[in-house]
Amino acid sequence: MVKKKFYWKTVFKNISQSKGRFFSIFMIIFLGAAVFSGLRNTPYTMASSVDTYLNNHNYADLTYIATLGFSDEDVAKVRSLKGVKKVVPCYQFDALFSHKDGKSGVTVYSQDHYDQNMLDRPEIVKGRYPKKEDECIIDVNLGKYNYKIGHTIELSNDNGTKTYKIVGIVNDPRYISNVDRGTNTLGDGTNSGFVEVLNDGARELGLNSKVAQLRNNDHLYTSLLV
């Protein structure tokens, strides 16, 4: 008992005589434990946040892209598969848009309609969803080219040229990064952002006439959201 009492007396005496060193050691241990706890929980927190974000925006489980397109019969077959709850035929293609410094690439997406229940629902930053075939919503990143609501944007590719009126500025769940927008098959290969339109406004640029002739069907889609 005496030895134990003497031991603790010695410990506290040493601490009181070297407060600075004791405090430094304490802080090193505390910070190390805090950093370790943070790093250990970060993956789960990030995964949970991303999962919640994607669920809130009805992120599609699968995206099918066909070089020869999807007919209405193809869509019906996919829709009949076991476990498939929803199939959305649409267009996805690359295009170039003009600005004061030249032309840059964008990816164009489309759907039959835009509402709160759609798959891959864009998040409106400003404006509204398109309601007419000559209306579009644009990537918030395209604001650096001074595009604003009410302006028109001209898109072109090997299938032709079409002009759309900008009615909304959005973020899209398909792009988690605020910087990287992928690559483009046109121009210099870089992608500056995305533009989204209605299917009726996308068919002209999205469907290659040679593919339509090959399949003897001018009502084809280039991608399916499932």
Where are these predicted regions, by residue range?
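Membrane transport/envelope proteins' first extracytoplasmic loop
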Residues: 2-226
